[in-house]
C-alpha cells in the first residue's frame, strides 16, 4: 500500500514567502528593528510593502549597473550581498544574496540593520524616500497585536 502524506507533512515542504502585514510586524519587532537607529517599526513595514509586497522571494534586476535587489527589503547585490554575478560587488553585509530569499528573514533583518547604520539611514531605500519618509505611518501597524 502507498504511503499517504498528510496535509501537515506537505506544508512543511513549502517555504513561507509572502508575509501578512501584522505577521511581518511581529517578526521585525522580534528581530529588533522597532526604533532601530530611530526608525519606527512602521517605517520598516511601509518600506517592505513598497519594495517587495512583503514577498521574501522577490528579485529585481537593475540593468544600468547589472545588480539585483533581493528579498523582502530588496537588498542590492552591488553594495550589500554577493550573488556572484554583479560586477564590483562590495558585499558589505558579508552574505550570499540567496539567503535573503528564504523564509527565515533574520539574515535580511541583520543586513537591513547594517544598511540603515550608514549615514544615509533609510534613505538607502528609494521606496522609503518616495512613500514612507515624513508620512503618517500609523496604519502600517494598525490592528496588529504587537
Curated annotation (Swiss-Prot):
* Main location as per UniProt: secreted
- Reactions catalysed, as given in the entry: Hydrolysis of (1->4)-beta-linkages between N-acetylmuramic acid and N-acetyl-D-glucosamine residues in a peptidoglycan and between N-acetyl-D-glucosamine residues in chitodextrins
Q: Where in the cell is it found?
A: Secreted
Q: Which UniProt keywords apply?
A: Antibiotic, Antimicrobial, Bacteriolytic enzyme, Disulfide bond, Glycosidase, Hydrolase, Secreted, Signal
Q: Which cysteines share a disulfide bond?
A: 22-144, 46-132, 81-97, 93-111
> Cross-referenced InterPro entries, in alphabetical order?
Glyco_hydro_22, Glyco_hydro_22_CS, Glyco_hydro_22_lys, Lysozyme-like_dom_sf
Family matches, as SUPFAM superfamilies: Lysozyme-like
* Thermal dependence of catalysis: Stable from 20 degrees Celsius to 70 degrees Celsius. Activity decreases sharply above 70 degrees Celsius.
User: Acyltransferase among the record's keywords?
Assistant: no
Q: Which Pfam families match?
A: Lys (PF00062)
Q: Name one GO molecular function term.
A: lysozyme activity
Q: How does activity depend on pH?
A: Optimum pH is 6.0.
Tissue-level expression reads:
Expressed by the skin glands.
GO CC, alphabetical = extracellular region
Q: Does the keyword Hydrolase apply?
A: yes
Instruction: List the GO biological process terms.
Output: defense response to Gram-negative bacterium; defense response to Gram-positive bacterium; killing of cells of another organism
Q: Which PANTHER family match?
A: LYSOZYME C
Similarity annotation: Belongs to the glycosyl hydrolase 22 family.
This protein is called what? Lysozyme C
Origin organism is: Bufo gargarizans andrewsi (Andrew's toad)
Amino acid at each position: 500500500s502507498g504511503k499517504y502524506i498528510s496535509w501537515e507533512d506537505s506544508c512543511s515542504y513549502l517555504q513561507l514567502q509572502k508575509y501578512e502585514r501584522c505577521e511581518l510586524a511581529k517578526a521585525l519587532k522580534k528581530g529588533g528593528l522597532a526604533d532601530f537607529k530611530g526608525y519606527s517599526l512602521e517605517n520598516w513595514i511601509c518600506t517592505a510593502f513598497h519594495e517587495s509586497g512583503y514577498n521574501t522571494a522577490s528579485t529585481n534586476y537593475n540593468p544600468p549597473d547589472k545588480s539585483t535587489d533581493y528579498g523582502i527589503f530588496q537588498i542590492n547585490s552591488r553594495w550589500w550581498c554577493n550573488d556572484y554575478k554583479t560586477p564590483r560587488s562590495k558585499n558589505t553585509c558579508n552574505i550570499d544574496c540567496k539567503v535573503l530569499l528564504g523564509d527565515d528573514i533574520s539574515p535580511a533583518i541583520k543586513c537591513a540593520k547594517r544598511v540603515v547604520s550608514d549615514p544615509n539611514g533609510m534613505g538607502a531605500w528609494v521606496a522609503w524616500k518616495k512613500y514612507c519618509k515624513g508620512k503618517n505611518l500609523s496604519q502600517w501597524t494598525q490592528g496588529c497585536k504587537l
